[in-house]
Amino acid sequence: MTINIGANVRINRLGLIITVVLLILLYLYSIRESSYYSQLINKDEVSLRNLLAGAYRAAELGGLEVVAVHDNPRYTIESKGKTKEGVNDPVTAADYQSHCAMYHFLSVAFPGVVVISEERSRSCEPAGTPDLQNVADSLENYDTGYDVLVKASDVTVWIDPLDATKEFTENLLDYVTTMVCIAVKGIPIIGVIHKPFDSKLTYWAWADHGASKNFQNIPASKEPKIPILTVSRSHAGRVHNASKVAFGDNVKIVSAAGAGYKCLEVAAGNATAYIHMTNIKKWDVCAGAAIINALGGTVTSLSGEPMIDFGPGDSTVLEHGLLATMEDHKWYLDKFYNL
């Protein structure tokens, strides 16, 4: 009988190599899982990458609630009163259900982080422990660079459970978004905007780290370009008059709803500037400001003040209007400064 010792040695060596590789992979996976869950329960420190994953998932969950309410034709519409422009400010079950889904998901996932929402609800169901790992894994397709750990006390999360509620009630669904913004030491650095009806797309950007792939097809600037201003439907007339003074007839004004929608229009190059001439709430603009800044644009008040006061103790209202651009920001500021 002949024994092929060389073949056995080769087989055993191959088996040993496979075993070692599998053990290494198992070890790396266990470290990752341990790191992930330790960050999830660590109230003192938080991973910005995990926060991005959580914001992404929260925006999607809110969108599912918004769509569910829309599909129920019997939902009720209440009113918060009127805006300064005299426009009714409605609120619906979609606002509240989206708030519950988004707020409790983020609060449970990141217990040491302050979460500020536009809405409050008295009847939110208790939330279970969120599983962010699958969402975090989906971000592997994006080059977000290195992770960053920050003090949880330095982080404020701003959420808008349903932007453009009035248009939601009017079935103008293209304007509707759910939004999450992550501010560190008062500065918006991560923004997530989800469109629950318009192709169900989710847009995000993280300053100095990366952005969602749906921002990769932004057209390059073509000169010369006339100013294309996107403005709120509720006070388009005022901006129209001011714009005529600032630019004469060499301007195009596009009325739209939802601060999130308008910020995305600027980021996509469909508008050269987003102008808002009255006070605006921070949950309306935080995500859009973070995205535009991360993509290389600029967002300030109409008096040029930067977006740096998004901490837990700051006012929820931005005064002195809003200007968002991808380029020529100072030129637009100068045009509107004295109007």
Spans of model-derived segments:
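Acidic beta-strand-loop-alpha-helix segment within the catalytic core
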Residues: L28-S30, M179-L264, N270, D314-L339
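DPxDG-like acidic metal-binding loop motif
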Residues: E140-D208
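Oxyanion/phosphate-interacting regions
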Residues: M1-E60, L64, T83-K84, K244-F247, ...
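N-terminal subdomain of lithium-sensitive/metallo-dependent phosphomonoesterases centered on the IMPase/IPPase/PAP
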Residues: T2-L162, A242, Y337
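Residue-level signal for inorganic ion chemistry
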Residues: G62, V66, D95, L106, ...
